[in-house]
């Protein structure tokens, strides 16, 4: 499969066969804990605007950007909500985006709800300026760099930071595969694991009944160690 298709769908393939995307990685307890801790901690720190006069620095609470950065960037989010999403986007995708809302005179009056990084395409124009494109509720939006707040993470290039999901896809994929295999073992495993052997020839119905009995009485972690009673010359062969 073309890797570009995976990226367009917000996921990347791995050698383990697992598909890595935001939802699958956050399904890993360790990854969730790390992202939640870092994003929540950083977002809880107040983002201030300062004014320097005569070498002294004071909080510029009367500055128009103070309310946007410190209190509430938009009508739907507090500063904590906004910056928590931004930080989580940086940790997972290496980029965070938000539309800059301006008044007619060009003054910044708000920052839009952060844009999901997978939806954003960045390209450089012949003029050297950056152009951003994304889809919002079915509406295609193209904006210049003066209309987009773009925070880049570690690595990458001017078009964007290095995606953690892409860089660590093999490790994430392996962790997902191990978790899936463990779950399958607990769900389908038979304790003890082996073969049910008999000298008689079983009919189709008898085989079905035997399989259903094994699944009902002995499959799964909850039935581990349960004693098995056999009759009619049946024998359990441990594997």
Q: What is each model feature region?
A:
Residues 1-239:
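Structured, contiguous alpha/beta core segments that scaffold functional sites
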């Amino acid at each position: 499969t073309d890797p570009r298709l995976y990226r367009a769908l917000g996921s990347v393939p791995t050698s383990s066969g697992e598909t890595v995307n935001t939802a699958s990685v956050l399904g890993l307890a360790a990854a969730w804990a790390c992202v939640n801790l870092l994003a929540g901690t950083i977002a809880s720190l107040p983002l201030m605007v300062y004014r320097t006069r005569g070498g002294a620095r004071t909080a510029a609470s009367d500055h128009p950007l103070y309310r946007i950065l410190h209190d509430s960037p938009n009508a739907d989010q507090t500063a904590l909500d906004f910056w928590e999403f931004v930080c989580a986007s940086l940790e997972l995708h290496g980029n965070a985006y938000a539309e800059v809302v301006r008044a007619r005179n060009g003054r910044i009056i708000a920052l839009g709800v952060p844009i999901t990084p997978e939806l954003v395409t960045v390209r450089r124009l012949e003029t050297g300026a950056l152009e951003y494109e994304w889809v919002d509720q079915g509406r295609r939006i193209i904006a210049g760099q003066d209309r987009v707040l773009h925070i880049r993470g570690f690595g990458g290039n001017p078009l964007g930071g290095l995606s953690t999901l892409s860089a660590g896809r093999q490790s994430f994929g392996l962790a997902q595969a191990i978790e899936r295999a463990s779950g399958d073992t607990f769900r389908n495993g038979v304790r003890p694991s082996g073969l049910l052997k008999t000298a008689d020839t079983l009919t189709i119905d008898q085989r079905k009944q035997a399989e259903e009995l094994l699944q009902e009485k002995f499959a799964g972690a909850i039935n581990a160690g349960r004693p098995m009673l056999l009759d009619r010359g049946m024998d359990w062969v441990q594997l």
